[in-house]
From Swiss-Prot:
The keyword rRNA-binding belongs to this UniProt entry's keyword annotation: yes
Protein's recorded name: Small ribosomal subunit protein uS3
Taxonomic lineage from the root: Bacteria, Pseudomonadati, Pseudomonadota, Alphaproteobacteria, Hyphomicrobiales
Subunit structure, as described in the record: Part of the 30S ribosomal subunit. Forms a tight complex with proteins S10 and S14.
A GO CC term attached to the entry: cytosolic small ribosomal subunit
GO biological process, one term: translation
Described function: Binds the lower part of the 30S subunit head. Binds mRNA in the 70S ribosome, positioning it for translation.
Positions of region (Disordered): 214-244
Skewed-composition ranges (Basic and acidic residues): 229-244
Family listed: Belongs to the universal ribosomal protein uS3 family.
Keywords: Ribonucleoprotein, Ribosomal protein, RNA-binding, rRNA-binding
Top-level taxonomic group: Bacteria
Amino acid sequence: MGQKINPIGFRLGINRTWDSRWFADNAEYGQLLHEDLKMRKFVMSELKQAGISKVVIERPHKKCRVTIHSARPGLIIGRKGADIDKLRKKLSDMTNSETHLNIVEVRKPEVDATLVAQSIAQQLERRVAFRRAMKRAVQSAMRLGAEGIKITCAGRLGGAEIARTEWYREGRVPLHTLRADIDYGTAEAETAFGICGIKVWIFKGEILEHDPMASERRALEGDAQGPASRERDRGDRRRERDNA
């Protein structure tokens, strides 16, 4: 089952937490859920060039707090914060609550599965060879500390008459191990031959404590360095000592 299920949903409550963090009674639950979906869809389409990793929505008492994780926060904020004020007003119009907007920078987009998938999709739309795009993404992720990565591309790859699925993997991606910190993201590339689907799994190491917030806290602290990265750091320090 670990091979088939969404790795993030599989680990909810273990080392991952929900992107919508609020409670509601039955009367207003459906309305709030639709508001969340509407806001997420709007942000992802409106800020396509800003590299949106995820949108977290929290609802304290009669308020709505939206946190956007982005690789390019400057594009969202705009000159002197003009763009972020417009975005806050548009989001406020979608909900009846007072809306607060936070922007969080993704410091390592190369090891964020959603951003990697979006990057490959953009390259396919620019007619870059899919194998080259996949290999480049894998090498960048492994260089920046990922312990393993798997990428699949499906569709009429290279303009072929028959659709097929191609995949590339490097390192370990243990989908059955619940303590594994696995990031998962998808994207669609709208090419001249049709839509190609991209899926990305990135293994960032193991989280031994039972804490639903552990994965997010680890990403925010920039503690995504795997053993390969630490080994390279040790090798660099060893060479510096030898040269000295």
